[in-house]
Amino acid sequence: MTRIGVEPSLSDVEELLKQKGYDVVRIQNEQQMDQCDCYVVTGLDSNVLGISDTTTKASVITASGMTADEICQEVEQRVQ
């Protein structure tokens, strides 16, 4: 199952992704950055949760300016 990490402030996105059948976890710390296939972040802070120097092979989607539906469509495209 595809695992999606989301920032805690994106609860609407979290719920919509769960409804679509994704395994969704809230990103709480740097250690979780290697546990997901895709991440959704707010983009309000370039140092997301203090992990600006973390690298990941997973897709990172910046949610700024997007609706929950648009974010879900972007997730679906990136995890195919």
From Swiss-Prot:
Transmembrane segments: none
Domain of life: Bacteria
UniProt-recorded name of the protein: UPF0180 protein BPUM_1317
UniProt cross-references to Pfam families, sorted A to Z: UPF0180
Annotated signal sequence range: none
Protein family per UniProt: Belongs to the UPF0180 family.
Taxonomic lineage of the native organism: Bacteria, Bacillati, Bacillota, Bacilli, Bacillales
InterPro entries: UPF0180
